[in-house]
Regions:
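Juxtacatalytic substrate-recognition/specificity segment
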Residues: 31-168, 185-186, 208-211, 253
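Beta/coil-rich, acidic/histidine-enriched accessory regions frequently appended to metallopeptidases
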Residues: 32-42, 48-50, 213, 247-376, ...
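Amphipathic alpha-helical substructures
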Residues: 88-90, 167, 188-284
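Short coil/turn segments that connect the beta-strands within blades of beta-propeller domains
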Residues: 317-319, 377-379, 422-424, 466-468, ...
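Beta-strand C-termini and the immediately following turn/loop, strongest in propeller blades
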Residues: 322-329, 339-340, 370-375, 382-388, ...
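Conserved blade-ending motifs and adjacent loop-strand segments that build the rim/top face
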Residues: 500-503, 537-552
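Outer-membrane beta-barrel initiation region
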Residues: 572-573, 578-676, 680, 684, ...
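C-terminal outer-membrane beta-barrel translocator/porin domains of Gram-negative envelope proteins
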Residues: 612, 686-692, 698-700, 705-712, ...
Length: 987
């Protein structure tokens, strides 16, 4: 379930795969995904305990103990509701894995990639596990648990491991939201907007359902669809639909679901649902659209890369607005400065990709909360951003975009900054021990003080113009209400708004006499209101169709206006309105103070039974982790390769056993790896038998060898201890030590004899070895690269490694240095200038053998046709988009991209006479590999280079490459053009 209504970010390899690749032997799997991956850092050590309740097997840790009874009560209450509604019982204890905070939840090993801050929780179908943090307010936590538990019931009703087709997303997520039993105001807003503005897709057409910029709309359409089923067919109709879905999904088709469940055709179901939904929201058709308000301050999406506005803060002068907006080019959020006069873009304060932080932090309330703030002098914009485990407060200059100040927080979910008029302090909200409070931060010292210190969820603090009074929201009995207190005495809390509805994002008027805020009292729609602090009069300024949120006064030459975020036709826009003519006055009945109100209570109250507690076993619950994946590819030499991996993990994903099989040509490679991911330092043991091939014509014999005649193999059999220590998300140390049996040989014995004879004639050692090596290695790996669906877009990647193999008892002796450095320069939207330098050097009595060539390494040359103990290759490629997607008889192909590339490199063996280049007269063998042709001036001798053009497109998820290359020695270019086809990812 998503907290913020946005897409998940693109991430690198999972750490489990990255760790499994850290072997002491060459790993054939690297040709499938040639990236190093980022790190999921375990900042905390969890001493896991297990508690068994009537329906759950709860995994928690000692710091969670005080919350156990409460959360189990929520879970058992949810089970009672969902089981009753669906008339279904789960036959096993459901694994419920709990974290105290979201930052701890993000460290789970059960999510396949990185857990973004926008993911509230998840349920997975392989082991039917629920995984969630508990730092939501009580009523929202109850709803969250109900949502995820419904997924477990869905997985049990419609088993995912035997399905021929996927369950539609609107069914899975819609039923989960339906079972919560309530509508979130923002969710109801999106479905009302879709109904009134004629944007309801046909649910039976999956491609239409997924065609929304706001992914939450799919959840909400599903929620509404199940309410429609209940209204038309009753709860029994919902159950009939689910059991029919089970039968059809398992059987391989879904076209007959509606006929079998409801006796209507799919199109008739779509029409009936659309009619019902439009009729439901028909009374709202005459409400205000954004065009009724006046001025639109949003960036022009047709003229800029910026789309919607999710948070904003006006400057003190009212002439500029800082806004968090979506950047289509980067695929990320940015903070921009907008002109309040003509909505022109003044500056992007967070332009481009940065390693200073991982992501901007939005309010937990998304658009219904505050996420950024101008300082009172108008010189800087403040916001929270994620770096490491927690967030830091950043102050960025509006003139230069440079960071003026960065203050790390040791609290969770720090958000909603507000800079005080004294210039030395700031207000913000944050979580400690799972409870949200308002804090006062000293900007100079970096220290903070808890101002509210109560059991309620407090958020969105704002300061009065004179700097003496704080206004904020507190969640009471399932609703957000507005409170104030004097900054000098925070204990004197005063409740300003009352009633069973939400009042959010309060802020003072410029004269401090009013508080502006958004309220969903009327029709569960956020509208703008003000409360006169002297008279208590409440005025309402909008009557929105969608919703108007997060008001802030906008002062300027034209007088005072009220800026706010409005939702219409699926987009969040920044609007403004005059406050001189309110829509109406609102009466309010003052009620009891919040401290006298009993907060949320679950339906089932569970008493913890101490005898049901125990410690979790280290390897408890080992289980096959999903279906084994299948990877395939084709080298530029026409060699097919493929592989698969079987993974066994414990219930927490901390203990992993990986069994891998890879095939290249007729060669087979196998390895089994154990990796422990429970703590920050990951360690394990790998046993392997890997065989790879290369082509080599050394010692001036290249004219005598053809490709197959030069075929050699390298077989490594042994075991390695492996370890990784993440320094942060982007950098890590990798360690390995092992014992490996090396067997290197030419496939053709006659060729091997010829090479040995030639080595003796030259008085140099033979370069292929048989024996045992005991390597000990360390590498520094870094990857800041940002990826898109086609591959790298921006950033850098490097791996710098050293390995030493001592000689004792007849083992092979070698010392090896290996460095792979890549840099990606983004050009425009998705064009990339990619560079790479990979160098290696192995010394000692029996140095290691490296090989490269073909595919993405040195295009135009045979695959793995360069080999040696030392050498390098360098690449420079301009990759650019041609077609985003294209529909063909074979299916959807794309994106289609072009490549202009050039590469240079070479390798040689110990003792071999080798000259990379020269300026002396010589012979070029580019067009005549036997006799050559005379050349003068600078040219390559033993070095090699190529350039050309390529075409890449994706089919069934696999990148297909078509390359046309010219070979060159930098003096002579080949007359013929070499064509290569290969399947695999670019570096």
């Amino acid at each position: 379930m998503n907290r913020h209504h946005g897409l998940l970010p693109r991430t690198g390899l999972t750490l489990a795969m990255a760790a499994a690749l850290a072997l002491g032997a060459p790993d054939a799997r690297a040709q499938f995904i040639p990236y190093f991956g980022k790190n999921k850092v375990k900042y905390d050590d969890f001493a896991w305990r297990v508690y068994k309740s009537p329906h759950f097997e709860v995994y928690y840790y000692p710091e969670f103990e005080q919350h156990l009874a409460r959360v189990v009560s929520y879970a058992e209450s949810a089970y009672q509701k969902v089981s009753s509604d669906l008339k279904h019982e789960i036959s096993f204890h459901i694994p419920l894995i709990l974290y105290k905070t979201h930052s701890e939840f993000e460290q789970t090993n059960l999510f396949p990639t990185f857990v973004s801050e926008g993911i509230l929780a998840f349920a997975e179908p392989v082991r039917d596990r629920m995984v969630l943090p508990i730092d939501e307010p009580p009523d929202k936590l109850q709803g969250l648990i109900t949502h995820e538990l419904t997924h477990i019931f869905e997985f049990d009703l419609v088993p995912r491991n035997i399905m021929q087709r996927n369950v539609p997303l609107w069914v899975d997520e819609g039923l989960a939201d339906y079972e919560r039993g309530i509508w979130d105001t923002l969710d109801l807003m999106t479905i009302r907007d879709a109904a009134v503005t004629d944007q309801i897709p046909r649910l039976s057409r999956l491609e239409e359902v997924l065609d929304f910029a706001n992914p939450r709309v799919v959840y909400n359409l599903g929620h509404a669809a199940f309410e429609f089923m209940e209204a038309r067919y009753g709860k029994e109709g919902i159950r009939q639909f689910l059991y029919t879905l089970r039968k059809n999904i398992v059987g391989g088709g879904i076209d007959d679901i509606y006929m079998q469940a409801f006796r209507i055709k799919p199109d008739e179901f779509d029409e009936a649902f659309e009619k019902w939904l439009k009729e439901r929201f028909k009374p709202f058709r005459d409400k205000q659209r954004p065009s009724d308000y006046g001025k639109d301050l949003s960036p022009d999406a047709e003229k800029t890369a910026y789309t919607q506005v999710y948070a904003f803060s006006p400057s003190p002068s009212g002439e500029i607005v800082a806004a968090i907006t979506g950047n289509r080019g980067d695929g990320e959020a940015d903070i921009i400065l907008l002109s309040a006069k003509d909505r022109g873009i003044i500056r992007n304060l967070t332009k481009g990709f940065t390693d200073d932080y991982e992501n901007l932090a939005m309010s937990d309330q998304f658009v219904a909360g505050r996420s950024i703030a101008f300082d009172p002098r108008g010189d800087a914009v403040a916001f929270f951003a994620r770096k490491g485990k927690r967030r830091s407060l950043f102050l960025v200059s509006v003139l230069t975009g440079k960071t003026l100040r960065k203050i790390p927080m040791d609290l969770d979910q720090a958000q909603s900054p507000c800079l005080l008029p004294d210039g030395r302090h700031a207000l913000f909200s944050a979580l400690k021990e799972g409870v949200a409070d308002i804090y006062l931060l000293d900007l100079e010292a970096g220290t903070y003080k808890n101002l509210t210190a109560d059991a309620f969820a407090d958020a969105d603090p704002q300061i009065s113009p004179d700097g003496t009074v704080v206004v904020y929201t507190r969640r009471v009995s399932g609703h957000d209400k507005i409170y104030t207190f004097p900054l000098a005495d925070p204990s004197r809390k005063t409740q300003l708004t009352f009633g069973p509805y939400d009042d959010s994002t309060p802020t003072f008027s410029p004269d401090g006499m009013k508080v502006y805020y958004a309220s969903d009292e009327e029709d569960e729609i956020y509208n703008l209101r003000s409360l006169d602090l002297a008279s208590g009069v409440i005025q309402q300024y909008t009557d929105a169709l969608g919703g108007d949120m997060a008001p802030a006064p906008l002062t300027g030459r034209g007088g005072e206006r009220l800026a706010f975020i409005s939702y219409f036709k699926g987009e969040y826009r920044l609007q403004s309105i005059e406050t001189s003519e309110p829509v109406k006055e609102v009466e309010q009945e003052v009620q009891l103070a919040a401290d006298a109100i009993v907060d949320f209570q679950p339906d089932v109250v569970h008493q913890v039974v101490s005898e049901n507690k125990r410690k979790k076993g280290m390897f408890e619950g080992l289980f096959l982790e999903g279906r084994p994946p299948l990877n395939v590819g084709v080298t530029s030499g026409g060699d097919f390769f493929g592989g698969t991996q079987v993974a066994l993990t414990d219930v927490l994903g901390d203990q992993n056993f990986l069994f891998t099989a890879v095939s290249v040509r007729e060669l087979r490679s196998y390895d089994g790896t154990y990796i422990n991911l429970a703590k920050r330092f990951h360690y394990g043991l790998s046993a392997f038998d890997t065989t790879r091939f290369f082509f080599v014509s050394p010692l001036a014999l290249q004219q005598s060898f053809f490709r197959e005649g030069a075929f050699a193999t390298q077989r490594y059999t042994g075991a390695s201890l492996i370890g990784q220590y993440p320094l942060d998300k982007f950098r890590r140390l990798e360690l390995n030590a092992g014992v490996i049996r090396v067997d290197e040989a030419f496939e053709n014995p006659e060729v091997e004899a010829l090479v040995r004879q030639r080595a003796e004639q030259l008085g140099v050692p033979y370069f292929l070895h048989k024996g045992t090596v005991v390597p000990m290695g360390v590498s520094l790996v870094s990857e800041t690269t940002r990826f898109r669906e086609f591959g790298p877009l921006s950033g850098h990647t490097y791996s710098l490694g050293a390995q030493y193999s001592p000689s004792f008892g007849g083992t092979l002796s070698r010392t090896t240095l290996d460095g792979d450095v890549r840099k990606y320069f983004r050009i425009g939207g998705s064009a990339v200038f990619a560079t790479r330098l990979h160098g290696f050097r192995s010394t000692g009595d029996q140095p290691d053998v490296f090989y490269f060539g073909g595919n993405m390494e040195l295009r135009g040359y045979p695959y793995f046709s360069f080999a040696g103990n030392q050498g390098f290759y360098a690449n420079a490629e301009f990759r650019f988009p041609l077609i985003d997607l294209m529909k063909t008889p074979l299916g959807i192909l794309g994106p289609v991209r072009g490549t202009l590339y050039g590469g240079i490199g070479g390798a040689h063996f110990k003792g071999e006479q080798w000259n990379f280049s020269t300026s002396d007269p010589g012979r070029s063998y580019v067009n005549d590999p036997v006799f050559g042709e005379p050349v003068e001036g600078f040219h390559l001798v033993d070095g090699r280079a190529s350039f050309g053009i390529g075409l890449q497109f994706f089919f069934l998820g696999y990148p297909l490459h078509f390359d046309w290359s010219k070979l060159t020695d930098l003096k002579v270019t080949s007359n013929n053009t070499r064509f290569d086809f290969w399947v695999g990812f670019d570096f």
